[in-house]
Every structure is written in C-alpha cells, then in structure tokens.
C-alpha cells in the first residue's frame, strides 16, 4: 500500500485507523476518577466482531501485535463462551453480494470462510454480509458453506411466525430483535438470523451514546423487557471504526460499559454462537430481498444515484455509479470468457481451481503453489499462465469492493483503488489472451463524471492515476536501478512482491557522480513471471539522474557496454557516459519517477536532509550568536524577529531529534536542549514530538527485554519524566501496555526477593508518570 496523504501523519488509512481503533480496542483502558489506568482489557474477547480478510492480511504484515491480539481474543472467547468464539467471518473482500454473479457470491463466501479457518484455527459459525446486503441466493451461499447464522437490520425482515404456526405476521421493521429466527431456503437448507437493535445501534453510531460508558450500559440494559417470557438477547451492530476512529475514546466507553454489564445481576455477556446453541430459533422469518443497512433504497447505493451519500457538496450527484458498475460488469464478463477459454488449456476445471485458489493467496510459498498445481493443472501447463489467469479472477473480485460506490465522488481514494484493481484485470487479461481490452473499458468509463471539474471523468482518472502506476517487470527493474544508487542490496533482494537476483554489479565514481551497472533477474512472487534485464544508472547529484533499463542481451554485448561505461567514468568523462547511456539504454530512461511512490518520497526526503545538513551549521551559528537576545525577548514578552525564531526552531528541533535517535538518549543533554527551547519560546514540531514518543517506546521495549536491568529502568523513567515536565502530548499506549503487563508478571518476584527496593521505587514512579493507578487501586 502506497502513501495516502489524506491519512497524514500516518502512512495510509489502514495505519491511521489501526492506531485510532483496531489497536486501542485490543488494549482498552478502564480509568478511575483521576483518569488513571485501572485496567487494560481486550474488547474483542467479550464481543462478537468481524474483520475482512484483506484487512487481516494487512494487519498480519504491518501491525502484528494487534493482529495477534485479535486472534488471541477469539481463543479466549472460545473458552469463555462454551466453545463458541467471538470472531465472525465475512464475505472475502466486502462486495455487495446481491449485485454479484452467482459464481462470485459463492467464491466470496468460500474464500471468506477459508481465510477465517486458516487464521482462527476453526470453522466460522457466523458470517457478516457486507453492508448487511442480502438476498435469498446470498443466504443459500452461506448455508452451502455451513454457516449457521448472520445478522441483519430489522427492516430487512418481511414477515415472521412461530415455528409450527400457519399465519405469518408482517414485520414492518418492528419484529422482536431479542431472539434468533430461522430462515428456510428454497434448497431445503436453513440459516439462523439475528436482527440487531436498530435504535440503539444508531444512537451508538450517530447520537454520542459513546460519550460515557455508563450511558451505553444503561441504554443496553434498558432494552430488556419484563413482559417477554423468553430469554432475551440484546444485541447491536455498528461499524467497528465507531469505537475510536469515528468517536475518540469510544473503545474506553465500550470497555467500561461491558464491565458494568458483567456486574449487573441477572444479566450476562454472550456471543451469537453461544446464544444460538443454548436458545435455538422458535420462530421463522422471511427477508426483504436486495436490502442493506446503509441504503434506504435497497442496494441502489452501489449502482445508481439513489440519493444516499456521506454528505455531498451542494449540487453534487452520484450519477457516476451506474456507468462505473456497467463498465466493471463488462470487464468481469470479458475476463470470465477469457478465463474459461484460456483456463481450459491449462486447468482441469478452471472454476474449481478458482474456488481453491484462496489456499495460494494465503500461502504463496513454492510448496503451496506446487500442491495447488498438482490438484488442478493439466500436465505441461505453464505455471505463470495458470497464476496469471487466477490472479486476473482475484482482481476481478477485488474491483467490486463496496466502498468504491459508497462515497460521494468517483475521484475518491476508494473508487480510484477499485480502478487500480480493474487496471490489473486488464493487464493480466491482455497478457494471457493477446486481446486489446483497455480502449473499450476507457470508453465505458467516460460517462462517469466527477463532481469536481478538474478531475474529469472515471476515464480521465484511470488514465492519470492507474496507467502510470501500472507495474511490470521492467518497471521493477527500473526501480531497482535507481534505488541501487542510494542504498546497498544483497545479491537477492525483495522489492514488494518481486524478487530481484543480481548476476553482476559494478559501481564507479567520478567526483560527485556515481554510476551503477548491473545485470539482474526479476521474478514476480505472485505470478512467477521472470525476465532478465541490464541496468545502468548515473547519479549526478541531488535529483539529476541518467541511464536506463533494457532486456538482457548478455554475453559479449553486455561486457562491451560495461567496459565502455567504466572506462569513460572519470573526471571530465561524464558527457561521454551520458551519450553512451542514451545510445544503449535510451528506450527506458531513468528518473526519480522510476521509483515507486514511497521510495520517491524517501529518497527526496534523504536528499532534502542532506541539503539541510549543509545549511545546519549556518542556522546554528545564527542561533548561538543571538541566543541571549532570543532569551531576553522571550522573558520580556516581546515578539522575536522571524528570522531568529526560524533559526532557533530549526536548530533546536534538529538537535533534539538527533539526541532522541541515540540508544539510549543522552538524558542530561536532552534536558538541557528542552530547557533552552522553553527559555527561547521554541515549540517542538510534530516530527520531534513523534521522535520523543518513539524513543520512549524503544526504551520501554529495552526494559521489557531486560526487566532486572536497573539502568534501563532508570533511563525509561527519566525519559518519561522529561517528557511530562516538558508538557509534551505523547501517545504512551504501548509503553503503558508493557508496564501494565510487567507489573503483573515481574513486580511480584522482585518484591518477594527482598532486595529490590530501588527497583520497586523506580518502577512505581514510572507507573505514576505513565498514569497507571497503583496496584492496590486495581480491582482483583
């Protein structure tokens, strides 16, 4: 995932929402009246929850502690709730199932169930329907896969009756949501449906019910009705992001509410699986087909300008939804024709292979691919062709991810992302079939107009953002060539989902100029496509680059070109080197744009840092010379001249960041710099504050690794003290988590030893400064 600027200061929206929601719910705080941490709990272990498969894949790679906490919560809930885990599966990549083809419905359900099983170590009992979008065929797909239940909104019930009775009762959106219902299906199968409490769910999402945990608890408890004679289940359903992302500290309100409910006589927490096992349906229901919880017009939000949006600008419309879906439907159908035709040449049963391809998606190892090919490939089938066909189908599913239609404009990042998926379908379909499909897709995207005139149409967005970002092996080789000028690689390097093997490498310098010449093999870890390239890249300083990439010619030709370049690479020979590069590598010229987006930013940042380092001494001299004048201005409350203020801010922030980068930081020097910043009225910028938080996190991890090391404890305690004294607003969540766990696991042994008085004093002081309540204050 590349940088998403709108998620700043985080790298992307997954990272931001993980920080604001997914991670906090795994370590939710319960506070006392002094806002000290009384307890840290994993909300996921108490409530039913679901994560999409693609999000879990990202969490496993990018936020492993949070990912493991989610898996552990399900394991704990299996013990807590009589063998029924809290985790619920989801249709694979959150497509609107009623708008999908029958085949895609079943693949989405099967892939979602299989992904769940491999992650959580058990088969799913329940499955969340994306946006609760439902029709009978979707329920059939769930039942075929052995799913026992799903959850819907009350208005999605058409009518209900008690089992064994003849007469149906119209639901009208008001059926009893405190019991499960059986939905009989045309196949003879059945599936249980829970209907969540709509008013309370809406109050949580939109009416500030999460402002206080006791308010949420009282509202939930108030939903029980003594008139009902059956065992009642009060259940609500909301977007998970509600708890922390949409409503800050919502995870704390939830944690406190759960604690209050657990201590209420006559009431206990449960999950859907346990409740269903203990209280099977005594009533049946029929659904209103093609409905969803987030559209009052059925499922039109994902294919037409129905009026549902997220607060569009005045005069905006969503007429772009229809041509977008029509274009993708056309592409899906063309991809299916190609898949069946070309797949029949390499696969025993192409569609059966697609159903099982989830095993390869979850495990890309050579062994996994070999097992898959043994089951499905015809003798002599070309591996890359097989994988490209199946990847084409995977992206044809991904391009229907529901958020692509949910929001206000076709230019939003969610819609642009599904266009990227469509672009990958085009790339793979054209490669395996040798047909030309992209011009037709562009024509079909042209009627999808953005509400922002400068963004044009979906066609223009595709041309501007999808086509230039398209990857192939040559683009990876170009990226590698440029990056090799700035950093060192081993002979085998991983570049995202590609593997680059270096056959030959030579670097020459002439003054500031640097020339890298290489012969490499690039291999896709996804499709196993492989090609060899020859690279030559010349860095002339700052962002000036020359060179290029060409398909390998090998042998004497490569040796001759390398010899010519290295011979000319000397002072005064740079113009000749550039002419040689143009002559031999001019077809694919290199520039900073050859880098993938994240590396573009990183390299440019490094170049800027290098430039700033040259200017740093000038700023420091200016700052040091006028330091007494700055202090006097600050003491007298007189505004500091802009040039001096800028010099002071630049110099002090740079020095503090540099000190924080040491392991461990030199604490006396750090205190002195912070005092100087205070005396001169200098505010620490965001990067310095984040560096301070990162230093505390690293110090807490060093202490966790060696809890008996008094120096490490002292360093951490002092660092936190310095931050508090400087009144820095820091995120100390991870340091608090480690402290909380260590107090239970380490402190008792130190105390029992009888010779840890200094350690205990420092440790307890650290707890106070991390705002953790004393051990005696924490309820057992």
Describe the residue ranges of each PLM region.
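Active-site and substrate-binding clefts of carbohydrate-active enzymes
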Residues: 1-32, 53-54, 168-486, 511-526, ...
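Short linear interaction motifs
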Residues: 27-32, 378-390, 498-504, 653-659, ...
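Leucine-rich, hydrophobic repeat-scaffold detector
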Residues: 492, 509-512
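Catalytic alpha-helical scaffold of carbohydrate-active enzymes acting on polysaccharides/glycoconjugates
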Residues: 15-18, 22-125, 133-202, 210, ...
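Positions that flank functional sites
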Residues: 132, 157, 277, 415, ...
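Charge-dense, extended regions
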Residues: 531-533
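Extended alpha-helical scaffold segments
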Residues: 622, 626-780
């Amino acid at each position: 995932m590349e940088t998403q600027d709108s998620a700043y200061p985080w790298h992307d929206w997954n990272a931001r929402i993980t920080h604001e929601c997914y991670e906090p719910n795994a370590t939710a705080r319960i506070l006392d009246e002094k806002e000290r941490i009384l307890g840290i709990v994993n909300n996921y272990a108490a409530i039913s929850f679901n994560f999409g498969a693609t999000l879990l894949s990202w969490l496993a790679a990018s936020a492993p502690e949070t990912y493991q906490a989610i898996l552990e919560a399900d394991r704990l809930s299996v013990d807590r709730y009589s063998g029924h885990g809290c985790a619920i599966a989801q249709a694979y990549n959150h497509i609107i199932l009623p708008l999908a083809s029958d085949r895609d419905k079943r693949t989405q359900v099967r892939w979602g169930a299989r992904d769940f099983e491999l992650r959580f170590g058990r088969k799913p009992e329940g499955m969340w329907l994306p946006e609760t979008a439902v029709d009978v065929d979707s329920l059939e797909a769930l039942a075929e896969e052995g799913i026992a239940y799903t959850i819907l909104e009350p208005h999605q019930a058409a009518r209900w009756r008690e089992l064994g009775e003849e007469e149906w009762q119209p639901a009208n959106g008001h059926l009893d949501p405190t019991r499960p219902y059986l939905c009989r299906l045309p196949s003879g199968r059945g599936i249980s449906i829970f209907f969540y409490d709509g008013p309370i769910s809406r109050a949580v999402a939109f009416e500030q019910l999460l402002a206080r945990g006791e308010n949420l608890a009282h509202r939930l408890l108030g939903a029980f009705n003594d008139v009902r004679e059956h065992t009642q289940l009060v259940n609500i359903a909301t977007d998970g992001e509600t708890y922390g992302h949409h409503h800050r500290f919502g995870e704390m309100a939830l944690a406190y509410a759960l604690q209050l409910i657990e201590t209420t006589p006559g009431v206990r927490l449960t999950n859907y699986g346990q409740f269903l096992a203990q209280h099977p349906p005594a009533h049946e229901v029929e659904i209103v087909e093609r409905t969803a919880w987030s559209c009052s017009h059925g499922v039109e939000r994902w294919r037409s300008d129905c009026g549902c949006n997220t607060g569009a600008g005045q005069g905006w419309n969503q007429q772009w939804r229809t041509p977008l879906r029509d274009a993708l439907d056309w592409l899906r159908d063309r991809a299916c024709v190609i898949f069946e035709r070309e797949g029949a040449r390499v696969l025993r049963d192409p569609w059966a292979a697609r159903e099982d391809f989830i095993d390869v998606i979850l495990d890309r190892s050579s062994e996994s691919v070999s097992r898959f090919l043994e089951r499905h490939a015809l003798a002599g089938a070309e591996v890359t062709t097989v994988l490209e066909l199946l990847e084409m189908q995977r992206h044809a599913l991904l391009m229907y991810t529901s958020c692509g239609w949910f929001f206000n404009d076709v230019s939003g990042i969610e819609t642009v992302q599904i266009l990227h998926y469509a672009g990958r379908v085009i790339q793979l379909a054209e490669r395996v079939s040798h047909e030309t499909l992209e011009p037709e897709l562009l024509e079909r995207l042209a009627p999808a107009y953005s509400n922002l005139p400068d963004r044009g149409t979906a066609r223009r967005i595709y041309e501007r953002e999808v086509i230039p970002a398209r990857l192939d092996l040559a683009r990876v080789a170009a990226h590698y060539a440029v990056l090799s000028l700035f950093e060192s690689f081993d002979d085998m390097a991983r570049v995202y989902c590609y593997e680059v093997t270096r056959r030959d490498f030579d670097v020459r310098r002439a003054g500031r100029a640097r020339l890298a010449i290489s012969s490499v093999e690039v291999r896709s870890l996804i499709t196993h496509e492989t090609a060899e390239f020859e690279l030559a890249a010349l860095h002339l300083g700052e962002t000036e680059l020359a060179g290029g990439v060409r398909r390998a010619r090998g042998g004497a030709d490569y040796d001759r070109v390398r010899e010519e370049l290295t011979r000319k690479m000397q002072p005064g020979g740079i113009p000749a080197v550039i002419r040689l590069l143009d002559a031999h590598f001019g077809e694919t010229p290199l520039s900073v744009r050859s880098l993938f987006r994240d590396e573009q930013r990183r390299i440019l940042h490094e170049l800027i840092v290098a430039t700033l380092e040259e200017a740093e001494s000038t700023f420091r001299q200016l700052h040091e010379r006028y330091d007494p004048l700055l202090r006097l201005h600050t003491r007298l409350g007189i505004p500091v001249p802009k040039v001096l203020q800028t010099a002071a801010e630049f110099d002090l922030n740079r020095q503090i960041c540099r000190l924080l980068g040491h392991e461990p930081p030199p604490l006396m020097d750090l205190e002195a710099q912070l005092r100087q910043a205070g005396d001169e009225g200098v505010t620490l910028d965001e990067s310095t504050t984040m560096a301070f938080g990162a230093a505390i996190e690293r110090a807490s991890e060093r202490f966790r690794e060696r809890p008996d090391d008094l120096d490490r404890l002292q360093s951490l305690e002092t660092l936190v003290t310095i931050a508090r004294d400087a009144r820095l607003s820091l995120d100390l969540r991870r340091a608090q988590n480690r402290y909380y766990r260590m107090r239970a696991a380490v402190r008792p042994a130190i105390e029992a030893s009888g010779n840890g008085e200094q350690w205990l004093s420092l440790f307890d002081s650290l707890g106070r400064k991390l705002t953790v309540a004393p051990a005696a204050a924490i309820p057992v």
